[in-house]
């Protein structure tokens, strides 16, 4: 969409950082695919936010690189050492099964309702703003707690009190290419997590045993039961080794290396044209 107010610029280098397939989202602006084609033709370098996006677009650009979601490990890892609960979570009993993120058409509400019904003794703590869906359509039960939007700074305080995290994404066009940032954030917080089989979660996280994969409420319940009883020490050690290579600083350094290389090539080309 930025093309609509940047076409008059003549930069030395253009980079397209593509984090989602926005055209598949509910309410996507008309013409967004045409704008993307124009942008890709103009840009010398392209980054994508996950392997599935890379596979979708790699034949459409000759200098495309994949950078999955990174994580502020120190911020979320602080959840492992905190005690006490925020006021609106303090009276919620355990086990607590938590989610944080935008609550929209990408969430499978049947799975949320199913977990609640199958395990009424579990408490589902749901954090995040509602978007593009009617809040009245959210499943309601005594053990489902919709706590609304929280700030980024507050999130570790909530995650520190959760026993298991869930990512109950629907499998639809809006989730086909997502690489959820909350995956490494859950892991950095030390919260075991169960997800539906989103491609960029199954590989690498599911394949490595860092995230459990489930497709139905019944499967979610079985996986959560497993995680509630499983010791965390070995899992955490493996998770931390994986996260050590995923800081935003390291991701930015790798991006800058590509930018510097392309920038040097562009400068050389411009100087050659002046000779």
What positions do the PLM features span?
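Conserved donor-binding/catalytic core segment of Leloir-type glycosyltransferases
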Residues: 88-107, 112-116, 124-125
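Membrane-proximal helix-turn-helix segments that form the acceptor-binding/catalytic region
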Residues: 29-46
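A charged, aromatic-enriched C-terminal amphipathic alpha-helix characteristic of glycosyltransferases
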Residues: 232-259
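Nucleotide-activated donor-binding/catalytic signature segment of Leloir-type glycosyltransferases, i.e.
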Residues: 133-159
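Nucleotide-sugar-dependent
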Residues: 107, 153-158, 165-188, 194-206
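Conserved acidic donor-binding segment of nucleotide-sugar-dependent glycosyltransferases
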Residues: 207-218, 226-231
């Amino acid at each position: 969409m930025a093309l609509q107010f940047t076409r008059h610029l003549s930069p030395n280098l253009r980079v397209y950082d593509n984090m989602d397939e926005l055209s598949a989202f509910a309410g996507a602006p008309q013409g967004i695919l045409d704008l993307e084609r124009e942008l890709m033709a103009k840009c010398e370098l392209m980054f994508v936010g996950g392997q599935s996006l890379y596979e979708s677009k790699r034949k459409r650009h000759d200098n495309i690189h994949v950078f999955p979601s990174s994580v502020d490990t120190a911020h979320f890892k602080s959840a492992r050492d905190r005690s006490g609960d925020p006021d609106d979570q303090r009276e919620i009993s355990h086990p607590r099964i938590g989610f944080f993120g935008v609550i929209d058409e990408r969430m499978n509400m049947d799975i949320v309702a199913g977990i609640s019904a199958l395990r009424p003794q579990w408490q589902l703590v749901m954090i995040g703003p509602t978007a593009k869906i009617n809040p009245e359509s959210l499943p309601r039960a005594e053990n489902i707690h919709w706590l609304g939007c929280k700030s980024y700074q507050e999130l570790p305080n909530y995650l520190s009190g959760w026993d298991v995290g869930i990512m109950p994404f629907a499998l639809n066009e809006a989730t086909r290419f997502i690489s959820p940032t909350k995956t490494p954030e859950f892991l950095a917080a030390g919260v075991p997590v169960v997800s539906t089989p989103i491609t960029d979660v199954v590989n690498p996280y599911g394949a490595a045993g860092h995230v459990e994969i489930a497709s139905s409420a019944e499967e979610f319940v079985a996986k959560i039961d497993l995680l509630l009883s499983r010791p965390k020490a070995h899992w955490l050690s493996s998770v931390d080794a994986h996260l050590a290579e995923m800081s935003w600083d390291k991701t930015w350094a790798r991006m800058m290396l590509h930018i510097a290389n392309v920038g040097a090539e562009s400068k050389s080309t411009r100087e050659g044209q002046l000779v």
